[in-house]
Amino acid sequence: MAVTPEDLRYTEEHEWVRRIGPTRVRVGITDYAQSQLGDVVYVQLPDEQREAAAGESIAEVESTKSVSDIYAPLAAKVVAVNEELSNAPETLNADPYGAGWLFELEVADAAALDVTLGELLDAAGYQGVIGG
């Protein structure tokens, strides 16, 4: 069964979102997603300072099985990317909720972020999506 930490929010596209500041979140793929992908061999990260629309494809993860788009879970600016994945894409498989994070997004308004995060799935809701 896939690990689904209670302190994160989730999308139906198998991404997790962790608030790391009043207006900032960190994004990655879930344990379920990495297990479905198989061995990750390449990660294409978004450009820093890029403005992303909610639901927009902004990154790609390539595995031995397939290539998967990664979507922005909310409208925001990309403010950091995990450069370590360029040299060690397998980190996504080994530690999807820690060292395998993909990028960080920042919004202008903390209250709006509260609302947006509230609209994402909690751990139980995500377990329902993956049949857990």
Curated annotation (Swiss-Prot):
InterPro entries in the cross-refs: Biotin_lipoyl, GCV_H, GCV_H/Fam206, GCV_H_sub, Single_hybrid_motif
Q: Which keywords does this chain's UniProt record carry?
A: Lipoyl
Q: Cellular component per GO?
A: cytosol; glycine cleavage complex
User: Taking every annotated instance into account, which residue ranges of this chain make up the domain Lipoyl-binding?
Assistant: 24-106
The record's comment on cofactor binding reads: Binds 1 lipoyl cofactor covalently.
Q: Which cofactor does it need?
A: (R)-lipoate
PROSITE patterns in the record, alphabetically? Answer: BIOTINYL_LIPOYL
Please indicate which superkingdom the organism of origin belongs to: Bacteria
Its annotated function is as follows:
The glycine cleavage system catalyzes the degradation of glycine. The H protein shuttles the methylamine group of glycine from the P protein to the T protein.
Assembly and binders: The glycine cleavage system is composed of four proteins: P, T, L and H.
Among PANTHER family, the record links this protein to: GLYCINE CLEAVAGE SYSTEM H PROTEIN (PTHR11715), GLYCINE CLEAVAGE SYSTEM H PROTEIN-RELATED (PTHR11715:SF3)
Instruction: Write out the similarity annotation.
Output: Belongs to the GcvH family.
- NCBIfam families, sorted: gcvH, PRK01202.1
Spell out the HAMAP family in the cross-references: GcvH
Quote the protein name from its UniProt record.
Answer: Glycine cleavage system H protein
Q: Which organism is it from?
A: Nocardia farcinica (strain IFM 10152)
